[in-house]
Design a protein with these regions (language model features):
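Small beta-barrel nucleic-acid-binding modules, primarily SNase/OB-fold domains
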Residues: 1-207
Length: 207
């Protein structure tokens, strides 16, 4: 289990979500500056220090891409999976009838609209956010597609809200467990998913 923590202070454009934008509910673009990133190898005992590890850095995984592009990073919300607006079932292969086509999964629109409407309660088009992820080194934060993995927190009506948790608790995302997650993080997502399932079953008149 990772002991360090990476913290990213940035801004989130509410308009990136459907219907105005194309972001899925579990993938968020965050606006950043050169001083947005800070890291502590032991948050309980050592202060966070600004890190420049991502400036002009290239991430190599399924493809090569810049970690920061046009002052933006892509966050894959840790521990959750939401249905997609533009899902591609397979890699392009010669002879496939639906080669290259993208499909909209059930509730893909609803999940991202609900997230949009919730974030819009801030009354602003662009709102401050904080991304947190537990890693031993800053460069451990990426997935194979070059996205940052972490939790996003925003402030709505004076209250800090973890968007990963909010999506699961309200039934708009499923639990998806990562090797990088601690037992505490896994248990939190699991409890929220059980709460959501119990509430939805009750809403549909099921025991």
């Amino acid at each position: 289990m990772a002991k360090g923590q990476l913290r990213v202070s940035g801004q989130m454009d509410v308009g990136q979500f459907w219907p105005a934008g194309q972001s899925d509910a579990d993938t968020v673009t965050v606006l950043v500056t050169a001083n947005s990133f800070s890291f502590s190898p032991d948050p309980a005992n050592k202060p966070f220090k600004t890190t420049k590890a991502f400036q002009n850095a290239t991430v190599r995984g399924a493809s090569s891409r810049l970690a920061i592009r046009n002052n933006k990073i892509t966050i894959r919300l840790q521990g959750i999976d939401a249905t997609e607006l533009h899902y591609s079932a397979t890699l392009p292969k010669k002879g496939l009838i639906d080669n290259g086509k993208r499909f909209r999964q059930f509730f893909g629109e609803t999940a991202t609209v609900k997230l949009h409407d919730f974030a819009a309660q801030s009354g602003k088009g662009i709102i401050g956010c904080e991304v947190l992820t537990s890693v031993d080194h800053p460069n451990d934060v990426f997935d194979t597609f070059g996205s940052f993995i972490g939790d996003i927190q925003i402030t709505i009506k004076g209250k800090k809200v973890n968007l990963n948790h909010w999506l699961v608790q309200n039934g708009w995302a499923f639990p998806t467990y990562y090797n990088s997650m601690s037992p505490v993080e896994i248990n939190a997502i699991q409890q929220l998913s059980e709460f959501a399932r119990a509430r939805l079953r009750k809403a549909f008149g099921r025991n």
